[in-house]
Structures are given as structure tokens and as C-alpha cells.
Amino acid sequence: MNATPEKADDLIVVGKIFSVHGVRGEVKVYSFTDPIENLLDYPRWTLRHEGKVKQVELVSGRGSQKGLVVKLKGLDDRDEARLLSGHEICISRSLLPNLATDEYYWYQLVGLKVINQDEHLFGKIDHLLETGANDVLVVKPCAGSLDDRERLLPYTGQCVLAVDLEAGVMRVEWDADF
């Protein structure tokens, strides 16, 4: 395993190691990619835990009932593998595939101000939830917000009118009383 990290501000979290598998140093991974196997397309990962980072190299991986089972180069022992439990798996943002003009990665939406059709500022996007039917924006109040309510807005074409990453704003069709 290599100790040379990527630039911290360039990293995007794409998964997390949550346990060990077997006795030969394999780890169980929860992937944030869709489909989950896409995580295996990145041969080098930066692991991050409690402010420390290190680079690792993927040897192999396969799907399992609760995620992925992964073998990392130089990790051959269950006890050593256990030390990686809880580590975030990161890659450089530059490795992510380009999206269509009207598509966004979740990390791009976090922090955007959310303003409705009546020019009411609801707050900023804190994070997103995956519900199965559609993704949900979790909007928390910020300075200048209409009120102090947390709002859950569907991330759908009916609700989201426009996204302006440069201005840091998402415009939505959503009643302030909802």
C-alpha cells in the first residue's frame, strides 16, 4: 500500500469498507456507485479515515449479498484487513465519467442554495437520499432562509426547474407551505 495521497480537495467518496471477509485479507465494501460494481472500474483508491489518507491498488472484486468483496494489493491477512474497516474509499473527481449537460453528481449539488418559484430561499442542500422511487434533496436552513424548517424535496424534473453550479443555486417548483 502506498502512503502518497491524492489532493484532499480533489477526492470524492465512492464507497466505504465496512468489514473483513475470510482469512486472506479480503474486505467487504459498500459501494456508492450505481451500479455498485462500477466501483471496481477504478484500479487505484485513496482510503481516508480520521483525517489520514493512503493509496491502495485493487487486485480483484466481486459482488456479494450486501455489497462487494474486494482484494487489495499487499493486504493478505484478516487482522490487517480489519484495520481498514470504516475507511472511506475515494477517487479523484477527474476520473468520474462526463455527464450530459442536465445531469449532475450528488457532490455537485451539495451546498447549493435552493430557491423556489416565488423567490423564497429554503436553505442549502445538505445531502441527498436514495429512496428507490427518486432521489430526495435534504435542504437545511441557512442565513437568509424563509424559515428554520428542514425540507425534503424530490429530485425530479417536476420539482427541479434549473441548476446553476456557477451561481450556486438550484431553482425549484415547491410551495413554501409544504
UniProtKB/Swiss-Prot annotation:
GO terms for cellular component: cytoplasm; ribosome. Residues 101-178 form the PRC barrel domain. One of its GO terms (biological process) is rRNA processing. Pfam families: PRC_RimM, RimM. It is found in: Cytoplasm. InterPro entries: PRC_barrel-like_sf, PRC_RimM, RimM, RimM_N, RimM_N_sf, Transl_B-barrel_sf. Keywords: Chaperone, Cytoplasm, Ribosome biogenesis, rRNA processing. One of its GO terms (molecular function) is ribosome binding. Binds ribosomal protein uS19. An accessory protein needed during the final step in the assembly of 30S ribosomal subunit, possibly for assembly of the head region. Essential for efficient processing of 16S rRNA. May be needed both before and after RbfA during the maturation of 16S rRNA. It has affinity for free ribosomal 30S subunits but not for 70S ribosomes. Belongs to the RimM family. The PRC barrel domain binds ribosomal protein uS19. This is Ribosome maturation factor RimM. It comes from Pseudomonas entomophila (strain L48).
